[in-house]
Amino acid sequence: MAGEFNIRKSRQADAAAILSLYPRSFPDEDLVPLVRELLMIPDTAISLIAMNDSELAGHAVLTLCSVAGNNGGVALLGPVAVEPALQRQGVGTTLIRDGLRRMKETGVHLVCVLGDPAYYSRLGFVTESLVEPPYPLPAEWAGAWQSQYLGNSLTPDAGTLVVPSQWRDPALWGPDPAS
């Protein structure tokens, strides 16, 4: 279960294992280029891994962002991947909770995510209405844009999420038009 996993920041030596995890976790999506780029900006993208003994069990990234007109205080969660054989054992939940704690400790007050509402709502995420994603989402994905308020600010942000260049690919924010 989740208590058996050690969560820590990833190191450069972990990159190959992290990159090999994503095709197994998301066989229908190619997230490797994004993850590779995020691993190259450790001051902006906080990369966490869950270790099961000496084996990689999961990975999560939280990217520091801002809202147009404001400075910082916002992060984008994702991608999150768990070794398929270890899914539904609390690995992803443990990674995300640890990441949220770390974000709060660094002064982040809002964490946004584009993901399954049924999963993320269990972790305290709610549909986000004040901060818009950097690209328009398909109507059927509207409920997938969510956030969790961590405190650290008296007034909520409103506006468009400003993401680093690694996230500025419209294909990351909607279904593949070729599908």
Residue ranges of model-derived segments:
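Conserved active-site alpha-helix within GNAT-family acetyltransferase domains
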Residues: 105-109, 115-140
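Recognition helices and adjacent regulatory flanks at domain boundaries
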Residues: 28-29, 39, 91-94
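Conserved acetyl-CoA-binding loop-helix of GNAT-fold acetyltransferases
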Residues: 82, 88-101, 113
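Short amphipathic alpha-helix that is part of the acyltransferase structural core
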Residues: 1-34, 41-57, 145-146, 151-179
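Short glycine/serine/proline-enriched coil/turn segments at secondary-structure junctions
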Residues: 68-70, 137-138, 154
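Accessory recognition modules or surfaces
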Residues: 88-89, 93, 139-150
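Conserved beta-strand in the GNAT
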Residues: 47-49, 55-66, 73-81
